[in-house]
């Protein structure tokens, strides 16, 4: 099965954007490429500056989409907790425990 990533990206206004992808660093480049933007409308208006947190799973797109939907409903305060402590994901998500927090490499 394909590896999926669910991520939180920090924008220049300190907001957090949530999404899913099969290639985390390619997706970051797409969100930050101003000349050929393939990112979401939200990130066109607000410059993405970093990957704040990310989780990976081999459980498929459906599971990744469920987590993405749950993260989008969290308050900013709870998202900030996850950015600082991504391993605390299951305090905020009651779905299957198929996600592993990953160490973000500097861009």
Please place each PLM-identified region on the residue numbering.
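Structure-specific nucleic-acid interaction/processing domains
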Residues: 1-18, 22-107
């Amino acid at each position: 099965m394909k590896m999926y990533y669910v991520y939180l990206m920090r924008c220049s206004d300190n907001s957090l954007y949530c999404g899913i992808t099969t290639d985390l660093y390619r997706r970051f480049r797409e969100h930050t490429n101003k000349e050929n933007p393939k990112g979401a409308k939200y990130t066109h208006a607000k410059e993405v500056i970093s990957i704040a947190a990310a989780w990976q799973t081999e459980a498929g797109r459906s599971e990744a989409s469920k987590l993405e939907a749950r993260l989008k409903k969290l308050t900013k305060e709870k998202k900030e907790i996850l950015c600082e402590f991504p391993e605390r994901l299951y305090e905020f998500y009651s779905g299957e425990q198929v996600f592993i927090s990953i160490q973000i490499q500097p861009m």
